[in-house]
């Protein structure tokens, strides 16, 4: 029995723009001190699932990429905006991002983790990427804006995406945008999990094992008889050398006139 697909696989930009906007209405706390980070991580560690996102000041120069300026972590009613550009990357935050018991859900998680690794090497664990799991519900779209439109029927504003995330003070629009991006990931995951999958992932993924190529056997070298060295001539003994040295030198007889004429 096939399961009816509830969500549309794709949605156009025009359809997305016509939807009502969605925004986070809970408490937002901006963290830019070490003590504030400790308190935020302690609170977030008590939750089993939190929303996750990052922001980076845009660069308008080819080949230049800035480091992550902000990391957003949200529960259903409270969002922390952690300003990494104004404080160190604390171990409390590292432990939270490496904790497999606290699920962090976001979109394009792999890209965010790569960017965070420029600040501190992470053994990231407990992450769910909406882009990766969405196909299990027949959804082909990847962007957070379109995932929200398809799953929630709501539009996420992207007006502040290219704003300055290293500014001394955030605007109200920036705060709302950043908090909504992390929180809406929770809402999307909740809606997906309450809906039957049309392409369920296998219980256990079987890895394809590639047998190593066998090297061709080398034929054994033919056994050849060892080359026999030619018997070397015996070296003359010292006694023979001495006799040769003492042997009288015989002068050659001069040719007579008759022989000399014949030679000419």
What is the predicted role of each segment?
Residues 1-48, 119, 130, 200, ...:
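N-terminal accessory regions of nucleic-acid-interacting proteins
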Residues 160-163, 201:
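Short coil/turn segments at secondary-structure boundaries
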Residues 209-227, 237-258:
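Arginine-glycine-rich low-complexity intrinsically disordered regions
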Residues 25, 29-32, 36, 45-49, ...:
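Conserved DEDDh/DEDDy metal-dependent 3′-5′ exonuclease domain
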Residues 176-214:
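Mixed-charge, glycine-rich, non-catalytic linkers/tails in nucleic-acid processing enzymes
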Residues 233-236, 264:
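C-terminal alpha-helical interaction module
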